[in-house]
Design a protein with these regions (language model features):
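A short, amphipathic edge element
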Residues: 61-68
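Acidic/polar low-complexity surface segments
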Residues: 345-346, 488-489
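Extended terminal
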Residues: 2-30, 159, 225, 317-322, ...
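N-terminal type II signal-anchor transmembrane helix
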Residues: 2-61, 234, 244, 343, ...
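Surface-exposed loop/turn segments flanking beta-strands in extracellular/periplasmic regions
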Residues: 139-147, 349-359, 492-502
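Short, solvent-exposed beta-strand/turn "edge" segments of beta-rich domains on protein surfaces
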Residues: 256-260, 278, 618-622
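Elongated, acidic membrane-bridging lipid-handling scaffolds
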Residues: 145-254, 259-263, 274, 331-333, ...
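Flexible beta-edge/linker motif
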Residues: 71-135, 139, 152-174, 235, ...
């Protein structure tokens, strides 16, 4: 009896104690707070966020926004939003994502910085559009945001923020231009970005990786380190297989070009720094390549440019030092065409179509003032390998066409641009042209042909206005000089000094301008040689024609200059197919007002002159040779040539 009473008393005591604990107002208040916090976090906050996003977009941004699902874990400090869409009022898309996950860390209290363990955006899509009025849709969106009355100070440090891991997965970027007569749209997808330890804390750097696919199969890769305070980034950037047709779509109304073929590769190590409002950018070991390039004028079949490759290797660019160094440039295997129309306009000048601006308030371009520090440009070696040329000049009275089967060039170049007149030097110039033919436009029969034309050791100094060439050699080839029945020589008419094409006119104008400025161009060619040339001479004013065929023609000229005083040394020799040979050597002044020469004929056949002898005499010339050697001196005086 005593034991049962004692047990009941103990049980009642425990119950009373539990009741006191459970009914403690502080405990009840804590439980109520946790329940309320849970309800606010799990239920009310998602509902508020969904309504706020929708209302804010409609009232402030004048657009449409919606989120299908929002989940908040108030204990883990995570937010998970799915299927967000932001559209313009007419339902055109601006931004969307499949999922946004945020994981906020309480360690922010210890870092004194907002800390996110994870920011993850899945399947985001950004639509950037240039509208019909020329404005960017994002600019209109930015204008819709409420403006702060107090402009922030540019010197104020950014909010303290630390993101331990951020990732964009399977994103897409769509760019559209509706301002041109021919609208264009391209989408870059998939786009993947990853950042680690990204922070606005001073001198805090974190690694990043960016990968994206380009339209048509190209790729973009970008990795390195980044800091947001101060702004700094260093790493590797690469673009592979970028199709030129992608860029052409957005510029086709400004270009008189059909859709181009070709792709671009680019890679570089870079370092970017922004301190005290001054940007620093250095590119090292940069490589650039254009492959299978094909440019064709709209409405034309023949391409203006067709190249297997343009390669630039080991470039160095320094924005602060204002210098660009290119150790190696290679252009190889292809063809370049150019044509001048009747008005003297080069077809390459017509590739850019200028549209008249209808904006009366458009600013008037102001001439830029030279900066104190010029840009320094330098190329170590430029190599052009096996490139054919086609040039047609219809600005002449008789249009001419020049065809070169193969062009090879080696040169070095340097330049200073800005801070005064342009200074540029080309040296170490070597040039070789193969299979050269000059003909009337539209006529495939060459007027003059050369197997090769080679230039050795040339230099061009634009600052000093000087052109110097050590030697020019031409080999083989030939021409025909025909006097027709009317006594006209077509070749002489075609190459008449009075028939000036575009290039010759521009050279003459450049020379006149330089002389007017008191700093004329100087030119010097130490030696010119022609070997193995052939000339067919024919006079059709006689019946039968008088014909001479010259072969193995050798011409040597030395000291060709425009200094106005140095005489030109010449030496020429040839053989005659009909029999005999001849040579002429001596000196002639630059303007031809005096000359001294030695002429030598050995066994020159005069039998081809039979038609002339028959026409003017009653004699018949059956055979004969002439051999002679003489000196000739010529000069002009007031009374005439002597």
């Amino acid at each position: 009896m005593f034991d049962r009473t004692t047990n009941e008393s103990d049980s009642n005591g425990v119950s009373r104690r539990w009741r006191r604990v459970l009914l403690n107002r502080w405990l009840l208040a804590g439980v109520a707070a946790v329940v309320l916090y849970s309800l606010l976090g799990f239920l009310l906050t998602p509902w508020i966020l969904k309504r706020y996003v929708s209302n804010y977009a409609a009232e402030k941004l004048k657009g449409i926004a919606s989120i299908v699902e929002v989940s908040v874990n108030p204990f883990l400090f995570t937010l998970d939003a799915k299927d967000f869409v932001l559209q313009e009022a007419d339902s055109r898309p601006i931004f969307a994502f499949g999922r946004l996950f945020l994981d906020f860390e309480l360690s922010s209290l210890f870092h004194w910085a907002g800390t996110f363990a994870e920011i993850r955006i899945e399947r985001p899509s950004l639509h950037v559009e240039i509208q019909h009025n020329g404005r960017l849709n994002l600019a209109d969106l930015a204008d819709s945001f409420p403006k702060s009355e107090d402009s922030p100070s540019t010197d104020r440090p950014p909010p303290r923020l630390l993101v331990q891991h951020a990732e964009i997965v399977d994103g897409s970027f769509t760019f559209s231009d509706q301002s041109n007569p021919t609208p264009a749209t391209e989408t870059f997808s998939p786009l993947n970005l990853e950042f680690k330890e990204i922070s606005t804390l001073p001198e805090h750097k974190g690694p990043y990786t960016v990968k994206a696919d380009l339209p048509g199969g190209g790729t973009v890769g970008w990795q390195g380190e980044i800091s947001l305070h101060h702004i700094f980034s260093e790493g590797e950037l690469s673009i592979a297989g970028f199709k030129l047709a992608t860029a052409w779509k957005f510029a086709q109304d400004e270009l008189n070009l059909a859709e181009p073929a070709g792709e671009m590769d680019f890679s570089t190590h870079y370092r970017f720094d922004y301190q005290k409002r001054t940007p620093f950018l250095v590119l090292q070991d940069a490589k650039f390549a254009l492959k299978e390039l094909l440019l064709t004028e709209k409405g034309k079949n023949a391409p203006l440019l067709a190249l297997e490759a343009i390669e630039v290797n080991d470039m160095h660019f320094d924005l602060q030092a204002r210098e660009l160094m290119v150790p190696n440039i290679i252009v190889r295997n292809g063809k370049v065409a150019a044509s001048v129309d009747e008005k003297g306009l080069l077809d390459w000048q017509k590739l850019v179509t200028l549209r008249e601006s209808t904006d009366v308030n458009a600013p008037i371009p102001i001439a830029s003032t030279p900066t104190s520090q010029p840009w320094h440009l330098k190329t170590g070696a430029v190599n052009v390998v096996n490139v054919a040329l086609d040039y047609t000049d219809r600005s002449r009275t008789t249009p001419l066409a020049l065809a070169v089967g193969g062009l090879n060039i080696v040169l070095k170049a340097s330049a200073e641009v800005g801070g005064g007149p342009v200074k540029a030097i080309v040296d170490g110039l070597k040039l070789k042209l193969s299979r050269i033919a000059l003909s009337e436009a539209g006529d495939g029969i060459p007027l003059i042909a050369l197997d090769t034309l080679a230039l050795e050791d040339g230099s061009i100094d634009i600052g000093s206005r000087a052109i110097t060439i050590t030697q020019v050699k031409a080999t083989k080839g030939g021409t025909s000089v025909v006097r027709d029945k009317n006594g006209q020589i077509r070749l002489v008419e075609l190459l008449s000094p009075g028939d000036k094409g575009l290039i010759k006119r521009e050279v003459i104008e450049t020379g006149k301008k330089a002389r007017a400025e008191g700093k004329p161009w100087s030119f010097r060619l130490d030696a010119f040689e022609l070997n193995g040339f052939r000339v067919a001479l024919q006079d059709r004013t006689f019946i039968p024609d008088i014909v001479y065929n010259l072969k193995d023609i050798r011409v040597s000229l030395k000291n060709l200059t425009n200094d106005g005083k140095t005489p030109i040394d010449f030496n020429t020799a040839f053989k005659v197919v009909q029999g005999g040979s001849a040579s002429v050597s001596g000196q002639v002044s630059q303007i031809g007002d005096h000359a001294n020469a030695r002429v030598k004929l050995i066994g020159l056949s005069i039998k081809p002159l039979h038609p002339a002898v028959t026409k003017f005499t009653s004699l018949a010339l059956e055979s004969g040779n002439v051999s002679a050697s003489t000196r000739v001196s010529y000069h002009t005086a007031k009374s005439g040539p002597q």
